[in-house]
């Protein structure tokens, strides 16, 4: 037996170093399958559906319990390459996967992140579009849309106006995926600008459209999330790195303030999937040359990791009856920031609320009963990669048969269309705005 060769083999990494090239569908699939095979204890590879041309929409899950949800462990996701000709995010997510699995057990921060978070990574939502690009271009290429020539970031239901378009297979697959997991936080990776953009992307007068903005009830949290990413990217935070394009102070913008769009994915996530999502524009050039990929990784690595950690902001817990039975489908909302589609507990009675440090009143409402009110104080720093844990015991005897196990969907119609301008579901208060500013400038 050749012992030197044996020892050399043991020292080599389980996955060969991922090169900084663009990986077409076959190469991407081969890499993902190799990772899933060699790191099977912390990864789970699955397809959430197929593109128009039958290509798999792969998702690799990284976590200590990758195959199933565990109570108390929040679900996080990254999605890239929604526009097929915007390619940097696709490669960054492959390198993020490589970094996570090879750092587990070696880097304490990454190990803690994998222990405490279930991370879902979709490198390409539009593989047909990516494969259709024949001549990469900085501004626009055939391949932005899917094979049926639909822009997937205009293809979701819209809460502000009717979006009567043919729902595409890629969009339907993502919508179904969102129903299967309790996603808490997400980001959607794009290219063609350098900015972190937060909801809303569309708007009405009640959300601030008259003032060229459209703000959610959680605007303070969204601004904080966007700044968290942008501030760690040395080029994005400058706000003016892309020539002949709009400048963004501190590398951050409200989506509607930049330009309104109908049927976007980040608004859909926030309103109908109970998931906070922002859009990350990562490169001035949509499809830059391969030799620039290492610098993109270096500029985004810290931001990508730090953003995942934000899934542990705020408070989480379960809602129980007096016999200790978890209560699904119970409305859990923070006073003065009601969502137009109320956030509800999942089938395990779990809730997750992303909140900045401070004092909050939480209303817990079982259908047909008066709200139960509880107060929480979110500390300045999360404890060991965990949000504040606050289980809530409701004064009910026995399981409530009137509560359905699964969450009833809010109708996918323009929910904001006829809402009064003063509604709490549309206007963040002055207090929330001031809190947001304090966290941005004094963090």
Swiss-Prot record:
Tell me, in one coarse class, where this protein mainly resides: membrane
Any idea where this protein resides? Cell membrane
What controls its activity? Inhibited by O-phenanthroline and MGTA and activated by cobalt.
Lipidation (GPI-anchor amidated serine) occurs at 423
Q: Which residues form the propeptide?
A: 424-443
- Which chain positions carry the site (Probable structural role)? 277
Record's signal peptide: 1-17
- Which biological process, per GO, is one annotated for this protein? protein processing
Carbohydrate-modified residues: 38, 115, 164, 363, 384
Supply the alphabetized keyword list.
Carboxypeptidase, Cell membrane, Disulfide bond, Glycoprotein, GPI-anchor, Hydrolase, Lipoprotein, Membrane, Metal-binding, Metalloprotease, Protease, Signal, Zinc
Looking at the record's lineage, which domain of life comes first? Answer: Eukaryota
Q: What class of enzyme is it?
A: hydrolase
Q: What cellular component GO annotations does this protein have? A: cell surface; extracellular exosome; extracellular region; extracellular space; plasma membrane; side of membrane
Task: Please tell me where Zn(2+) binds in this chain.
Answer: 83, 86, 190
Q: Which InterPro entries match?
A: CarboxyPept-like_regulatory (IPR008969), CPM_N (IPR033842), Peptidase_M14 (IPR000834), Peptidase_M14_domain (IPR050753)
Q: Does the keyword Glycoprotein apply?
A: yes
List the PANTHER family: CARBOXYPEPTIDASE M, PROTEASE M14 CARBOXYPEPTIDASE
Q: What is this protein called?
A: Carboxypeptidase M
What organism is this sequence from? Homo sapiens (Human)
């Amino acid at each position: 037996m050749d012992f030197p060769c044996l020892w050399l083999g043991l020292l080599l990494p389980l996955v060969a170093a991922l090169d900084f090239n663009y990986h077409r569908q076959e190469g991407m699939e081969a890499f993902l399958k190799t990772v899933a095979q060699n790191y099977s204890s912390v990864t789970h590879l699955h397809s959430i559906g197929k593109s128009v041309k039958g290509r798999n929409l792969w998702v690799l899950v990284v976590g200590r319990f990758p195959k199933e949800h565990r109570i108390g462990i929040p679900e996080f996701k990254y999605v890239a390459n929604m526009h097929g000709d915007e390619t940097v995010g696709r490669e960054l997510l492959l390198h993020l996967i490589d970094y996570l699995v090879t750092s587990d057990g070696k880097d304490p921060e990454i190990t803690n992140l994998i222990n405490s978070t279930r991370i879902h990574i979709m490198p390409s939502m539009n593989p047909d579009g990516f494969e259709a690009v024949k001549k990469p271009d900085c501004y626009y290429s055939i391949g932005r849309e899917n094979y049926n020539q639909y822009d997937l970031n205009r293809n979701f239901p819209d809460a502000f106006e009717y979006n009567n378009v043919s729902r595409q297979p890629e969009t339907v697959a993502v919508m179904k995926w969102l129903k299967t997991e309790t996603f808490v936080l997400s980001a959607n990776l794009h290219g063609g600008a350098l900015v972190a953009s937060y909801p809303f992307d569309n708007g009405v007068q009640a959300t601030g459209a008259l003032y060229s903005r459209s703000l959610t009830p959680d605007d303070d949290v969204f601004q904080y999330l966007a700044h968290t990413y942008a501030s760690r990217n040395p080029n994005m935070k400058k706000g003016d790195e892309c020539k002949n394009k709009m400048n963004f102070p501190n590398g951050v913008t409200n989506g509607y303030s930049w330009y309104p769009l109908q049927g976007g994915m980040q608004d859909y996530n926030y309103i109908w999937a109970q998931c906070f999502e922002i859009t990350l524009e990562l490169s001035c050039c949509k499809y830059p040359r391969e030799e620039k990929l290492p610098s993109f990784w270096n500029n985004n690595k810290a931001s990508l990791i730090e953003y995942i950690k934000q899934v542990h902001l705020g408070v989480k817990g379960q809602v129980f009856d007096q016999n200790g039975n978890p209560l699904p489908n119970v409305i859990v909302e923070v006073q003065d920031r009601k969502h137009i589609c109320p956030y509800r507990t999942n089938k395990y009675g779990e809730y997750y609320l992303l909140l900045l440090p401070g004092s909050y009143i939480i209303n817990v409402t079982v259908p047909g009963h008066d709200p139960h009110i509880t107060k929480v104080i979110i500390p300045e720093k999360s404890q060991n990669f965990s949000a504040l844990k606050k289980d809530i015991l409701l004064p009910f005897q026995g399981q409530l048969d009137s509560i359905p196990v699964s969450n009833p969907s809010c109708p996918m119609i323009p929910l904001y269309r006829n809402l009064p301008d003063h509604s709490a579901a549309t206007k963040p208060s002055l207090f929330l705005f001031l809190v947001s500013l304090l966290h941005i400038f004094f963090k």
